[in-house]
Amino acid sequence: MAEMNPAQGRVVFEDVAIYFSQEEWGHLDEAQRLLYRDVMLENLALLSSLGCCHGAEDEEAPLEPGVSVGVSQVMAPKPCLSTQKTQPCETCSSLLKDILRLAEHDGTHPEQGLYTCPAHLHQHQKEQIREKLSRGDGGRPTYVKNHRVHMAGKTFLCSECGKVFSHKHKLADHQKIHTGERPYKCSKCGMLFMERSTLNRHQRTHTGERPYECNECGKAFLCKSHLVRHQTIHSGERPYECSECGKLFMWSSTLITHQRVHTGKRPYGCSECGKFFKCNSNLFRHYKIHTGKRSYGCSECGKFFTERSTLSRHQRVHTGERPYECNECGKSFSLKSVLIQHQRVHTGERPYECSECGKAFLTKSHLICHQTVHTAAKQCSECGKFFRYNSTLLRHQKVHTG
């Protein structure tokens, strides 16, 4: 076996830690402190189990034969380690350098002699550290930034963005984001995907397969994440609130999309025509206008549609289905959007207001029609007569054309 690299042969706790002052520790929030505690305890347990030391004072401790420890790169320079002893032992008043050595020292007192098994002692030491960290008296805390000690492990670094992966194939998948590579093609519509799993999910849109079924209502979905989102409908929980208008949402993604109504932000742009959209799904649907692909055909009349949902709505013309019922008057509608508009008759809500005169309307189309009152009148080129609406002008012109 090749001789172990001396740089890898000895691992001390400081090799995987970054030291901060007490003042710097005070700037960390609770989540960061909890992360520090959990990572440090995990590293402590692993180093202890391997017989590795925790600091420079244990320089001569032997490493267990046949075990190599790979250390993830620390992303900030490690400052010079202080030799000041700041941690008092509550039993004998001895001063120790840090809470790690204090935890080890605590195990030497007679009342703790019952920890004859190393595993039990290590567990006790971890509890000592956890207690001290919870009290906030950690002295000079060591904030470990998401880096772990891996036994005989490797990490794979993306040269483009610096992100680290535990497996080579995960790095390869990630790098397709930078290269733009999409090696998986749908045989039905020609769409390209970065990952085979994404292609498999997409192909269900063509086959109609929906393997994930809700046990409450029986509705089925293409992928598990869609089912999980749907199930919140049954619980009624809406934990995400808009700080602007107070509206509540079931999902954080819906809240983010909604907030663009207030900010006017439209981050998704079409590379073909330059039109921008509030959410990615709207851009995806819009792209089909440029490709001209209509994959979903009606079996009754042969008409084709770009979206399965549009086909489903269209088929209600043939079936006569009206699944959306008004709970005020019992009237039914084929589209949910039409039901929402109808319900404003009962509530009196008129959300579309004219910026010129303040008059409000039930629907946006009614507002647009009204706004022509404030714009220039339409004149007939034949007789010079004026009309308020373009549609009225077109009807009038038939008098001249016959």
UniProtKB/Swiss-Prot annotation:
Residues 11-82 form the KRAB domain. GO terms for cellular component: nucleus. It is found in: Nucleus. Transmembrane segments: none annotated. InterPro entries: Ikaros_C2H2-ZF (IPR050589), KRAB (IPR001909), KRAB_dom_sf (IPR036051), Znf_C2H2_sf (IPR036236), Znf_C2H2_type (IPR013087). It comes from the Eukaryota. Belongs to the krueppel C2H2-type zinc-finger protein family. It holds the Pfam family KRAB. One of its GO terms (biological process) is regulation of transcription by RNA polymerase II. PANTHER family: KLUMPFUSS, ISOFORM B-RELATED, ZINC FINGER PROTEIN. Keywords: DNA-binding, Metal-binding, Nucleus, Repeat, Transcription, Transcription regulation, Zinc, Zinc-finger. May be involved in transcriptional regulation. A zinc finger (C2H2-type) spans 87-109, 156-178, 184-206, 212-234, 240-262, 268-290, 296-318, 324-346, 352-374, 378-400. The keyword Iron does not apply. One of its GO terms (molecular function) is zinc ion binding. Its main location: nucleus. This is Zinc finger protein 547. It comes from Pongo abelii (Sumatran orangutan). Signal peptide: none annotated.
